[in-house]
Amino acid sequence: MDSTRNSASSNSTGCFTDQKKRKALYEVFKKLSGVDCQRNEGNVVEGVTCYYGEMNKEQFHVAIFQTDKNESLFSERVFDLFDTNHDGLLGFEEFARALSVFHPSAPIDDKIDLSFQLYDLKQQGFIERQGVKQLVVATLAASGMSQSDEIVESIIDKTFVQADTKHEGMIDEEEWMDLVFRHPLLLKNMTLQYLKDITTTFPSFVLHSQVEDT
């Protein structure tokens, strides 16, 4: 896995380079962000249609979790990683790059790389126990679940026993990749199934209509 953090820093929109898919994703973006759909829409630069507007963290949380409940550390971390100019907002291209990683057809390496970055809270190049604990607790809370601190610590202990093969008290990128390949369910929350068919149907929380072919 490349340590240059390709999934968040890349300018590629990956699974959303196709114009029909970009337009469909923009419909979701418009609905969630409330952008004026008539303003500056449709400018073409080098054969690519450019879309405009901005989305805040709360709106992005709805895109990730398909609910308007309180945002979580997970969605906040994803948002911050793709907010490349650190203005607290995502433009459409940043939004497309973020959701591209969550597409069912996105390369597994991109999902592994982004998941590592999410747990590496301090961006140090390795995962600490505290980073794992914060995200485990946040993910459970976002799912409407809660566990005692004792059970959470037990989960983290087991994770580090399996992952920290170098016995350094941390998990580096190589160890994380090995762990994920042994336990693919660790990437379950890195895939949003609704994105697979985004050109034919929107998630029900956004729209109840179909995208027309153009």
From Swiss-Prot:
Marked site (Involved in dimerization) residue numbers: 143
GO MF annotation terms: calcium ion binding; kinase binding
GO biological process: calcium-mediated signaling; detection of calcium ion; negative regulation of ATP-dependent activity; response to alkaline pH
Residues that, per the record, bind Ca(2+): 83, 85, 87, 94
Annotated InterPro entries: CNBL1-10, EF-hand-dom_pair, EF_Hand_1_Ca_BS, EF_hand_dom
Domain of life: Eukaryota
Family annotation (SUPFAM superfamilies): EF-hand
Known role: Acts as a calcium sensor. CBL proteins interact with CIPK serine-threonine protein kinases. Binding of a CBL protein to the regulatory NAF domain of a CIPK protein lead to the activation of the kinase in a calcium-dependent manner.
Residue stretches making up the EF-hand domain: 33-69, 70-105, 107-142, 151-186
Keyword Calcium: yes
Family: Belongs to the calcineurin regulatory subunit family.
Key words, A-Z: Calcium, Cytoplasm, Metal-binding, Nucleus, Phosphoprotein, Repeat
Source organism of the structure: Arabidopsis thaliana (Mouse-ear cress)
Pfam families: EF-hand_5, EF-hand_7
Subcellular location: Cytoplasm; Nucleus
GO CC entries: cytoplasm; nucleus; plasma membrane
Gene3D superfamilies: EF-hand
Protein name: Calcineurin B-like protein 7
Gene designation per UniProt: CBL7
Residue numbers of Phosphoserine PTMs: 204
